[in-house]
């Protein structure tokens, strides 16, 4: 017997959490036959809330801090983790989850919107650690290797998704700041030796204040600082509202308020206040007194209207109606329900919203549900040009053809909270005019900015070891796939210049003989890669953390119709492996449909792909030959599932997530029964393959019979496990066959 190995499968949120109820027992049953124990770790939003407040709970209600435990595990050489998408909670999502837990008898405290006492401040601090992208930075102890697997790419070529045609006279464009933003104010320094730096604000009267405790830096670490001017931002936003009206296009704002949980909600709030300026000019005081905070979106104002007296409320509503009439039309998230692009910060996430718009002829939906040309407002100009270059390319050359286009895999710098995505704990809304300085332990001023009240100042860190690992990964991928690799770096940008010095030094240490490796500024890199993509050629994008995020949505959505079908591997720096299931989110709309119609359209293809590479990694690390057989047969089963079109469909009564899990089980069992590499597995799975083959029609009928009516799983953020499991296993015949295994 080989020694038992462990794979950790994360329990997360929304659609992937429901899918886990169905898929995980199948995976555990198969893995058991290869001496592999598949355990779960609960890193869901509700699980993380409960773990943060043990002293508020009874002994029986307490849960371990699974995220902290996983954060330690990923530093071990034997780590093997399958990571599903989780919620990056905005304040509205966080408060909804808290309310749900409280209604179930968990006495967790309320989220203090305006903490006054020390206790409230301590509670708020704990909740703020759960907010935003709180999971990925803890687990991502490696860089990112994301690509479309051959089977998926071939399927997309044979079964192309819809692509909206582009008109040569499309008025769609990106609007971004030309000065006063983070990009134009960036400074960057590489520290030669380990030190710590203080971030000190000095006001006009000379009063000094440390904005946080000192930040420890390692030798060779790159630090950057930048500031966005509030004055410049407000002027820019007002200009764009006017310009959208003049051009007759929709106004839309594209931010990432979930991940960039300090800076982007502030920017979002300014956009709401500028768009609805007359409302705030006339009623700002009364709205503030009613608890309105539009950093949580315009929806927050609507939700608090009932706190106003009847006359004020009527006046505010009339003013809102007048603004809608006078201003450009807003892009809509849900035109039927009147939900605009400015209602909820977590509804429009730039990396998903921009590719969706580009795929839809460069259009978003107006209040009547009609597609219209759009002004896409992306205030900070660091990466906005990549989207403008893509729009220009489509306007000139027309839409891409999924049947002939190439692919753009990504190697992303991500480890140890690199760059902007690690900046939240070093991001501050400045309270008064003055200066912010970054000062090292010896008292040297490394960077300094003049700042104004309301400006957003931030510092980022990029450690040396992750950069070295990233360059190595890029060279490995270029060689293994025999594909040109482009570093998307702008030598005129301070941070990129610092990074480039390291990239050149580390490339010189590696064998790059015969490889095509180049460095291009992001817009040029985009044009180069888009040109090759249209010609059916492949190009690896080698990028920093933000572009990793943006491009692994942009290119897959154009190539495959979704980013959930990506292979997303995180080779951990200490030798373990983390396998992320796709590059998409947790699909709240899928859950909404499931609760209303008992039809879950979530596609678990990302999980199937991640499982196969997880088994393969385990086989290579431990010499477990059975794990390799599981990997190979799972890949074959996944390909068969795609070719036979057994992925979930959109409408109730059709095959859904549970049906696709049945077909995966059927094909996987058939492949195991047919293979000759491992006799034990062959014998073990032959009866299951026979039973499922015989009962296929009956099982599919049982799975579709339950659809078309509402289902109760006892919660949203914290569903009742028994009810959810029951809902996700509606076929008695399938359950029986699995149990026999």
Specify the residue positions occupied by each region the protein language model found.
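Short, charged, amphipathic alpha-helical segments
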Residues: 682-690
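Extended, well-ordered protein cores
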Residues: 2-269, 278-502, 506, 510-658, ...
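A glycine-biased, small/acidic residue-tolerant capping/turn segment at secondary-structure junctions
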Residues: 700-717
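Secondary-structure edge/capping motif, primarily at the C-terminal ends of alpha-helices
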Residues: 619-622, 672-676, 703-706
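C-terminal accessory extensions/subdomains outside the catalytic/core fold
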Residues: 719-741
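Terminal, compositionally biased segments used for targeting/anchoring and flexible tails
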Residues: 644, 648-659, 687, 709-713, ...
């Amino acid at each position: 017997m080989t020694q038992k190995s462990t794979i950790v499968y994360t329990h997360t949120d929304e659609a992937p959490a429901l899918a886990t109820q169905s898929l995980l027992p199948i995976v555990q049953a198969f893995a058991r036959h290869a001496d592999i124990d598949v355990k779960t770790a609960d890193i869901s939003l509700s699980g993380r809330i409960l773990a943060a407040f043990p002293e508020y709970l009874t002994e029986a209600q307490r849960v371990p801090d699974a995220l902290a435990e996983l954060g330690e595990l990923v530093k071990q050489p034997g780590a093997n983790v399958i990571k599903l998408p989780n919620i990056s909670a905005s304040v509205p999502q966080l408060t909804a989850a808290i309310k749900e837990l409280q209604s179930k008898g968990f006495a967790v405290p309320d989220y203090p919107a305006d903490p006054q006492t020390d206790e409230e401040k301590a509670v708020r601090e704990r909740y703020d650690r759960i907010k935003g992208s709180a999971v990925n930075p803890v687990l991502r102890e490696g860089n990112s290797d994301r690509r479309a697997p051959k089977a998926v790419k071939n399927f997309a070529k044979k079964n192309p998704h819809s692509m909206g045609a582009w008109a040569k006279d499309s008025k769609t464009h990106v609007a971004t700041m030309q000065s006063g933003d983070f990009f134009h104010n960036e400074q960057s320094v590489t520290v030669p030796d380990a030190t710590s730096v203080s971030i000190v604000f000095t006001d006009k009267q000379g009063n000094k204040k440390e904005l946080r405790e000192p930040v420890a830096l390692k030798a060779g670490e790159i630090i950057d600082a930048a500031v966005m001017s509030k004055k410049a931002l407000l002027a820019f936003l007002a200009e764009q509202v006017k310009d959208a009206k003049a051009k007759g296009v929709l106004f839309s704002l594209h931010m990432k308020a979930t991940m960039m949980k300090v800076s982007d909600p502030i920017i979002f709030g300014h956009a709401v206040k500028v768009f609805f300026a007359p409302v705030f000019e006339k009623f700002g005081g009364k709205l503030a007194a009613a608890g309105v905070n539009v950093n949580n979106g315009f929806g927050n104002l609507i939700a608090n209207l009932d706190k106003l007296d009847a006359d004020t409320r009527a006046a505010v509503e009339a003013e809102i109606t007048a603004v809608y009439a006078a201003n450009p039309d807003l892009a809509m998230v849900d035109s039927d329900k009147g939900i605009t692009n400015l209602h909820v910060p977590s509804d429009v996430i730039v990396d998903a919203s921009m590719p969706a718009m580009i795929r839809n002829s460069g259009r978003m939906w107006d209040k009547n549900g009609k597609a219209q040309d759009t002004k896409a407002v992306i205030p900070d100009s660091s990466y906005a040009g990549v989207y403008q270059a893509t729009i220009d390319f489509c306007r000139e050359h027309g839409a891409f053809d999924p049947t002939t286009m190439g692919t753009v895999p990504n190697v992303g710098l991500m480890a140890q909270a690199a760059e902007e995505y690690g900046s939240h704990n070093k991001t501050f809304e400045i309270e008064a005019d003055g200066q912010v300085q970054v000062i090292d332990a010896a008292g040297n001023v490394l960077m300094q900015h003049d700042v104004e009240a309301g400006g957003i100042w931030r510092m980022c860190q990029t450690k040396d070891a992750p950069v070295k690992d990233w360059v190595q990964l890029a060279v490995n991928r270029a060689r293994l796939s025999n594909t040109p690799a482009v570093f998307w770096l702008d030598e005129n940008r301070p941070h990129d210049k610092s990074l480039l010095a390291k990239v050149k030094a580390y490339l010189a240490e590696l064998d790059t003989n015969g490889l095509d490796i180049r460095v291009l500024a992001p817009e040029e890199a985009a044009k180069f890669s888009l040109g090759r993509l249209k010609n059916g050629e492949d190009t690896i994008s080698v990028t920093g953390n933000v572009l990793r995020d943006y491009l692994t949505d942009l290119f897959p959505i154009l190539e495959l119709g979704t980013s959930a079908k990506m292979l997303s591997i995180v080779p951990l720096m200490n030798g373990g492996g983390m396998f992320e299931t796709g590059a998409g989110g947790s699909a709240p709309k899928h859950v909404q449909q499931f609760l209303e119609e008992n039809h879950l359209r979530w596609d678990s293809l990302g999980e199937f792909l991640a499982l196969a590479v997880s088994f393969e990694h385990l086989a290579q690390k431990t010499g477990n030959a059975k794990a390799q057989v599981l990997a190979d047969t799972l890949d074959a089963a996944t390909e068969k599932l795609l070719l036979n079109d057994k992925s979930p469909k959109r409408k109730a009564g059709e095959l859904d997530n549970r049906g696709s899990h049945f077909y995966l089980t059927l094909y996987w069992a058939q492949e195991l029964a047919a293979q000759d590499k491992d006799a034990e597995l062959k014998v073990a799975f032959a009866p299951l393959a026979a039973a499922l083959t015989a009962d296929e029609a009956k099982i599919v009928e049982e799975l579709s019979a339950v659809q078309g009516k509402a289902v109760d799983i006892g919660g949203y953020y914290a569903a009742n496990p028994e009810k959810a499991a029951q809902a996700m296993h509606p076929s008695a015949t399938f359950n029986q066959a699995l149990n026999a295994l």
